[in-house]
Amino acid sequence: MSDNTTLDNISVNSEKVVDYTIHHDDRKELERLVSHNKGVEKIVSELAEGAGQLGPLEQPYDIHKVETHPDPHTDYNDADPWKYPIDKETKLRLVDWTEGDKHNPKNFGKGFKWLCTVLLGMICFVVALGSAIVTGDLERPAADFGVSEEVIILASVTMFVIGFGVGPLVFAPMSEEVGRKPIYVVTLFVAVVFIVPCGAAQNIATLLICRLIDGTAFSAPMTLIGGSLADIWEGPERGTAMAVFSAAPFLGPVCGPIFGGLLCDYAPTWRWVYWTFLIVAGFFYVVFIVVVPETHHGILLKKRAKKLRKDTGDSRYRSFNELQIRTFAQVAKTSLLRPFVLLSELIVFLVTMYMSVLYGLLYMFFFAYPIVYQEGKGWSASKTGVMFIPIGVGVIASSLAAPFFNKDYNRRAQEYRDRGELPPAELRLIPMMIGCWFVPAGLFAFAWSSYQRLSWAGPCFSGFAVGFGFLLLYNPANNYIVDSYQHYAASALAAKTFVRSIWGACVPLFTIQMYHRLGDEWATSLMAFISLACCAIPYLFYIFGARIRTFSKYAYAPNMD
């Protein structure tokens, strides 16, 4: 705001322009008024965007009438220390964050933000670790239970990953009603507790059921952590934080066979795989619950409005969340039906298929590496597990490159904004167009260097290219879906997660048979050819994506000439 004592032509809406003449002593009050005006406009914008998808607004609240508030239809109650605007027609008082609000998660100190980010990433790492650590020691539990290799894979790996796909359909919408922290507390507690019967199981049925429960409960943090990071980080800063988080789902499965292989060779029983996982998961659960607070803005503002109503006796305080009414049918439609409807969208379908191929590759490696190194070269489980390290190094290298691609995106997007245009969603595809080639290149290198007579180094170091490509594909794909579907992005991502998890759960059931029948070289080459064909997907959408969205009733597409 200018230092002049006269402020002319403050526009509070598109139709009315009001002249104000103020003295220096009134400047602070005017600044607060303008600040709250922006806050109301923000809430009104959210109401207008969310009304169509989140259910009808509480009557008689009229968002069209509120667009001219707080001037000239809004007053401030001087006795109210919160200084929230009062709507003269509806008498409601809109509760939103005030400037510099210390309770706003985005205003947390940077050190605390990074502490929360690291803990969120570690929880995600631990969850992903739980899906893979058991693959290092499958023969001993199969012998104990008297079941085949396929059955023990079904019980210990497949059921866990199926839970990954089912859980998000329930936990994501539930977190919008009760907040993220209660979901974290309850689901992680259930997940940690059910590791115990897995380790103590006396029959295969117990292991199968408990691993399914574990996978479902552990899916909650994998679903909610992205939202938690968005709660605490501003847009320009979020890219680096998301790079830390997004590496965790890949590093966890990579480290799983390493730890599992060591336990297989040196632990007295296979049950120590679960006891070790219990210790790690339990430790991070306690630290996480103690340190990380509730960050969901809607829930925090709802609690503030409730407290204000109680403290002041004024029932007019309302948060944005309280201006929504959603029936059970609406919630069920949003969380259970819409994701499957969106799978009929070409963009969602093809991106989902691509991500499913990548996810399947990750779980295929858990069984391909033992075939190549343990069966082919006679190595131990622990030595074989070390061969996964280059994949992890590739993932880390890709995450370090993420800020560069994020900076490039911001530069390209700003060029559109400078011309008064919206940046197209297809700008998100540029890293995919680069990263897509690394995966088939790494797979072909793995395939044709896996002969028994050749060095171990070929299959080992080819994993770097695959790991590097994974993250360059995963993050941009999610961003592309979000930018393409805007309000329906959560449902589109839920659909992707469900299909990806189901496919990832199925891959271990046929990988061993595929390698034994096709041979190490052609089995891996088959997946390499499939991933090579998928390279066309980002290029297809980069060229035709904007036009494809114009034919969709769900996708967002700017007007095209």
UniProtKB/Swiss-Prot annotation:
For this chain, one GO molecular function annotation is: transmembrane transporter activity
Domain of life of the organism in this record?
Eukaryota
**Any Gene Ontology CC annotation:** plasma membrane
Subcellular location per the Swiss-Prot or TrEMBL entry: Cell membrane
Q: What is its main location?
A: membrane
Where do the record's glycosylation annotations fall on this chain? Answer: 4, 9
What is its induction? Expression is induced in presence of cycloheximide, 4-nitroquinoline-N-oxide, and 1,10-phenanthroline. Expression is up-regulated during biofilm formation. Expression is also increased in high-iron conditions. Expression is decreased after combined treatment with fluconazole and osthole.
Q: Tell me what topology the record assigns in the membrane.
A: Multi-pass membrane protein
Q: Which UniProt keywords apply?
A: Cell membrane, Glycoprotein, Membrane, Transmembrane, Transmembrane helix, Transport, Virulence
- Transmembrane region(s): 114-134, 151-171, 182-202, 212-232, 243-263, 272-292, 347-367, 385-405, 429-449, 454-474, 492-512, 526-546
Per its UniProt record, what InterPro entries does this chain match? MFS, MFS_dom, MFS_trans_sf
**GO annotations under biological process?**
hexose transmembrane transport; transmembrane transport
The phenotype of cells or organisms lacking this gene is:
Leads to increased susceptibility to cycloheximide, 4-nitroquinoline-N-oxide, and 1,10-phenanthroline, but not to actinomycin D, fluconazole, ketoconazole and colchicine. Also leads to attenuated virulence in mice.
Q: Which family does it belong to?
A: Belongs to the major facilitator superfamily. DHA1 family. Polyamines/proton antiporter (TC 2.A.1.2.16) subfamily.
Q: What is the documented function of this protein? A: MFS transporter involved in N-acetylglucosamine (GlcNAc) uptake. Confers resistance to cycloheximide, 4-nitroquinoline-N-oxide, and 1,10-phenanthroline, and contributes to virulence.
What name is this protein filed under?
Major facilitator superfamily multidrug transporter NAG3
Task: Please state the gene responsible for encoding this protein.
Answer: NAG3
